[in-house]
Amino acid sequence: MRRCRWAALALGLLRLCLAQANFAPHFFDNGVGSTNGNMALFSLPEDTPVGSHVYTLNGTDPEGDPISYHISFDPSTRSVFSVDPTFGNITLVEELDREREDEIEAIISISDGLNLVAEKVVILVTDANDEAPRFIQEPYVALVPEDIPAGSIIFKVHAVDRDTGSGGSVTYFLQNLHSPFAVDRHSGVLRLQAGATLDYERSRTHYITVVAKDGGGRLHGADVVFSATTTVTVNVEDVQDMAPVFVGTPYYGYVYEDTLPGSEVLKVVAMDGDRGKPNRILYSLVNGNDGAFEINETSGAISITQSPAQLQREVYELHVQVTEMSPAGSPAAQATVPVTIRIVDLNNHPPTFYGESGPQNRFELSMNEHPPQGEILRGLKITVNDSDQGANAKFNLQLVGPRGIFRVVPQTVLNEAQVTIIVENSAAIDFEKSKVLTFKLLAVEVNTPEKFSSTADVVIQLLDTNDNVPKFDSLYYVARIPENAPGGSSVVAVTAVDPDTGPWGEVKYSTYGTGADLFLIHPSTGLIYTQPWASLDAEATARYNFYVKAEDMEGKYSVAEVFITLLDVNDHPPQFGKSVQKKTMVLGTPVKIEAIDEDAEEPNNLVDYSITHAEPANVFDINSHTGEIWLKNSIRSLDALHNITPGRDCLWSLEVQAKDRGSPSFSTTALLKIDITDAETLSRSPMAAFLIQTKDNPMKAVGVLAGTMATVVAITVLISTATFWRNKKSNKVLPMRRVLRKRPSPAPRTIRIEWLKSKSTKAATKFMLKEKPPNENCNNNSPESSLLPRAPALPPPPSVAPSTGAAQWTVPTVSGSLTPQPTQPPPKPKTMGSPVQSTLISELKQKFEKKSVHNKAYF
């Protein structure tokens, strides 16, 4: 323990010796204006931005030890600067304001770790022009008498600027250059300019804007000038310098015949021109009175002293004098004004309307509507009168009510006139619009102040005439009824209205047009219904249209059109062409059965097909929409068919049902016998194949045959025409053609189809070419005209003899048509046809006959 104490004591003595041997650091003193050193006599502008590097502390240590810098401030002041301890850079951290603090005391220190050297420095804050002038002792108000002499001092303003130098100097000037006032630019004294005057009556208050401006200076590196403004209010004080003034001139008064003595006629008003301090005013009449009028000296009211009937003149020119009385009671300023008083007759009679029996304020008249334009309402006997005289008896007349219907004559009346009312708009006088027209006849005086007026009611009762046509509420009426509606059924009700009254407003209805035969209309109600015997059929005629006429008793009418549509009812079942039909089916090709529903619209005429019974039941399928029947997919040969139904000779019977889609639905059945063969059998005969292809369209076969015949005819015509032109150009005389007459009864020429033969008991229909007789030299009235004539022979070749003229050749025409052969036993064909061919021909005949019947029904 004792050894440790001795070691610590030795270490302390060693440190003391070393400290006495180490010299303290010191600052460099670089003089005034230097930005580094010990901040001696350092100054800084007050507009220096915060964060600026303003100075660098600089010093050294004799031993070369590292040194550090510090700056501190009195606790009662702001810490304006901060220092980098290593490099000595001093930064401004607070804004400077010279007006608040013009110098800053700080303690700077330098240390080498063992020795610390501190110095007290004073930093001067230099001025910048950052303050604006400021007026003191505001607001500024001055009271100035209006008679103050020009150049007199009115007021003094004072402004201070806390800046120093030019930035703290203040000069004054006025913002309004045309002001009657002026200001001394250095002292701020306000004066009334030379030659200027103040007038209380013209302007009681003046507002002077004074601007204080400093001398300018630098701020943040730029030259700036600050200014301030203030307003000086100068109130002008009134003085007695104005004469009295009359208000409301000129003055006119009127005295009427019933004015009583002592009545006030008019009142004059005057006031002191000096309104700030007005004097008392007295009124008096100077001349022109003649004792007829007097005036109240304090109020200025002029009154009449005599009865108007005693006055000698119609117009009096009075002169009223007003006098100011000073506060001492002595007369001061005076003024005079003329007053004109006119004695006039009393307008005491308003205009009055008179009828045949005296004064009347209501006039009535009955008249027909739509009178001629310009017609005078002679039933009105109206007189208007004003008993006053002269201008008092002049008044205007006008009609008050619906405008533009009537006009009144005369429009301006003097004393008395007969009133005439004339029709101006005949169309507006309509009984249907208004049964009663009411007007007011107004008479108003024109040139009188009273504007007396009077009114009289004019009531016009309109009488109806037949001036309207019955009018339907619609131009078209559309109705729909079912086709099975019984006779007498209601269809639609039409309505027409005639605005006229009485018998003229009664409407009677009737119908006309091609479609009106099946319908009737009630003449009074307009209800359209079917004839009791009418039977409607949508399949025959689905739509009707006709016209309805609405007519009044004088024959004025209007027309509307009616459209009636029959709604289809399912009243026709589907119908097959025959109840028993025969078809030939080639393997792989369907046959078709068809039923027709004569209903007019869908779905009543849409037919669905089904097989109700078949023997056997597993052989055929049918398309329910088209009626096509085909073998089931599993049957592809006659052998397969024989395996299913052994013992049958490829002839099957089906019961096919055709059912429409109406409600309720109808159906029909037909027995279909189908003979099935294969394509190999048909391939042996091209014509049979062709007939198989056209079995559902017999017109195709007819078309092919007709085309063949047309080709033959065309070739014949071409050959005849060529021969004719050759003979004509050869200039040869040919013998005249003979006239061919018909033979008594030649056998008809037919083209027989030898390879068609029917195995059934019914004979197949044959087609033959029927030639029409030539247009010339034929006896068309012959009973044998149905027989085909022989074709004329071609002309002989031309001879070599010269021709004296062109021979007129007549080329006969040949026409052909397909007609069925007469019902006589057909000759035996040279060859026998197959059963399929016979069946196809039978089916082709049936369809051809059905198509012919359909076409005849259509045409």
Curated annotation (Swiss-Prot):
The keyword ATP-binding does not apply. GO terms for cellular component: photoreceptor outer segment membrane; plasma membrane. One of its GO terms (biological process) is photoreceptor cell maintenance. Residues 36-135, 136-246, 247-353, 359-472, 473-576, 573-688 form the Cadherin domain. Residues 722-859 are cytoplasmic. It is a single-pass membrane protein. Residues 20-700 are extracellular. This is Cadherin-related family member 1. It comes from Homo sapiens (Human). The lineage of its organism: Eukaryota, Metazoa, Chordata, Craniata, Vertebrata.
